[in-house]
Amino acid sequence: MFHFEETTKTFYLENNEITYAFTVENGIPEHLWFGARIPRDDLRYTRRVSCTSCDAQLPGTMSENHIAAELPTYGRGDFREPMLGVRDETGNLLLHLVYTGHRILPQPRLDGMPSTFGGETLEVTFEDGEKGLRAVLLYTLFADAAALTRAMRLENIGAHTLMLDRAFGFSFDLPVGAYETLTLAGSWAAERTP
């Protein structure tokens, strides 16, 4: 269900129907594939090709504005909407979350949050040592359905107060295409209710 390819630093989350894959290059997570189940090939060829001197395929030249960021934040050269914004006591929003490790766990219960009971959960940990913030992304892939859930847990591991500006559980860059969007307006447990 979960596989980590050490040589390419690529995570493969897969069941009989789908594959979700992302890589961690220079400590930064980058989305590679979400769709029909595919072999565990080196998917780094699917990365976006930039038209600038910053090219994600050349070591040391990556710009986060040119990758499909798995965990986009403020102030890292990515001009799209970030999924996470954390302010320190000086008002600084800059974050530099770097991959520190991962582990596979039985499906944990998310205290105080609605949660599913799908199967094992992949926890991927990122830290900003200067700001004192740990972000843990939790991925659960259901064995018998084309469904993936993701959540994020934040921990203040420093000595200073941090203020949360925004925190989304998921961010997903879609390639250019013609899409239809279905929105169920309403509120929790009252979707499609005016």
Give residue spans per PLM region.
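Polysaccharide-binding surfaces and accessory modules of carbohydrate-active proteins
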Residues: 4, 9-12, 16, 29-194
